[in-house]
A protein has these predicted regions:
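Active-site core of glycosidic bond-cleaving carbohydrate-active enzymes
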Residues: 5-13, 63, 76-151, 155-274
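Surface-exposed beta-strand edges and their flanking turn/coil or helix-capping segments
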Residues: 43-46, 59, 178-180
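A conserved hydrophobic secondary-structure block that centers on an alpha-helix together
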Residues: 1-5, 11-17, 21-47, 119, ...
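Carboxylate/His-rich catalytic cores and anion/metal-binding grooves
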Residues: 21-34, 55-88, 154
Length: 274
C-alpha cells in the first residue's frame, strides 16, 4: 500500500507513535512510502499532499516517525535503507532546512531563515532521533555528530529572559523581544506559536531543560505561569484556539506540556492540567 499525504508537523508528535501500537503493519506501509519519496526527491517527506511536497511546515519529521518504528522493533522495515534516507535528509539542504547554515552557526539565524527558533528547536529533536538510529546500527561517528547537533537548542537560550530567542547571523539577539508575540508561518521566529509555547520543546532532554530553567521548583513555577498567563500580542493563527493561559489546545506545539509536570515536584498538576 502506498500513501501520498503526510501532514507530518501535525502527526509525528502523537498520531504516528499511536499507529505503531495500534496499526504496526500500516506504519510499515507509511514508512516504505516515505522512503520511496526519498528515492525520488533525495530527502524524506516534509509535508506531502497527494504526492507533492508543499513545504508549508518546518522540520524533517519523517525522521522521528521512522526512528520510532525501528527502535520499537516493528518488522518489515529495511533499517539500513531507512538510515540512508534519514541521514541524507539531515544533511542534504532543502526548503526550510539549509543544513550548511545549521552546521556553520549551530542554530538557524533569523536573518537567513525565518521561523528560526522553531526550526532550531524542532531540528535539534530530529537530529537526536538520527543519533538514536545511528547508535542502534553501530554508526558511532554519526551518533556523536548528531548528538552534538541535538544540543544546538542551547545556542538560542537567553538566560536573562528565560526563553529561547532568535539571533541573527552576527550572533546578536533579535530585538525587541516579546514572549507573547505570536507568529504564523513565516516572517516571525516562531511557527504558529510564541516563545512561551516553544520554550517547552526540548523533548530529547527534559532534565537539561529543567536545569536551564533553574531546577525543579523554578520549572514547576514556570509551568504554572504558562497555564495562567493570558496576555497575547501579535497575529494569532487561526489554528490556535482553546487557550488556557498560554497553552493553546487547538494547536500541536502545546499538546505535550501538561505532561512535563511529571518531571518536576508537583506531578499531580499533570492530572489537573490535562
Amino acid at each position: 500500500m502506498h500513501y501520498s499525504t503526510f501532514s507530518l508537523w501535525d502527526t509525528y508528535r502523537a498520531a504516528h507513535p499511536l499507529y505503531t501500537l495500534l496499526q504496526p503493519t500500516r506504519s510499515v506501509d507509511f514508512i516504505k512510502s516515505m522512503i520511496r519519496q526519498y528515492d525520488y526527491y533525495g530527502y524524506l517527506p516534509i509535508w506531502q499532499l497527494w504526492g507533492q511536497d508543499n513545504y508549508c511546515m518546518i522540520g524533517n519529521h519523517s525522521i522521528p516517525v521512522i526512528t520510532d518504528a525501528i527502535l520499537k522493533g516493528i518488522p518489515g522495515i529495511d533499517a539500513d535503507k531507512a538510515y540512508e534516507a534519514v541521514r541524507n535528509s539531515s544533511t542534504t539542504s532543502h526548503p526550510n532546512s539549509p543544513f550548511e547554515v545549521w552546521e556553520k552557526y549551530g542554530y538557524m539565524p533569523e536573518n537567513i531563515q525565518t521561523q528560526s527558533v522553531s526550526i532550531t528547536l524542532e531540528q535539534a529533536y530530529d537530529d537526536w532521533c538520527v543519533a538514536q538510529l545511528a547508535k542502534k546500527l553501530g554508526k558511532e561517528e554519526d551518533y556523536e555528530h548528531f548528538m552534538k547537533r541535538s544540543e544546538y537548542y542551547r545556542n538560542l537560550y537567553h538566560p536573562s529572559s528565560g526563553f529561547f530567542r532568535a539571533k541573527n547571523a552576527d550572533g546578536k539577539w533579535l530585538e525587541p523581544f516579546d514572549p507573547y508575540q505570536y507568529g504564523a508561518n513565516g516572517g516571525n521566529p516562531f511557527t504558529e506559536g510564541n516563545a512561551w509555547q516553544y520554550f517547552w520543546y526540548v523533548p530529547q532532554n527534559i532534565p537539561a531543560l529543567i536545569a536551564l530553567t533553574g531546577g525543579d521548583k523554578a520549572f514547576t513555577n514556570k509551568l504554572d505561569q504558562f497555564f495562567t498567563t493570558t496576555q497575547q500580542s501579535g497575529e494569532l493563527n487561526s489554528n490556535a484556539s482553546g487557550f488556557v493561559g498560554q497553552y493553546a489546545h487547538g494547536n500541536e506545539p502545546s499538546h505535550h506540556v501538561a505532561y512535563l509536570y511529571n518531571y518536576g515536584q508537583h506531578r499531580s498538576r499533570c492530572t489537573q492540567r490535562s
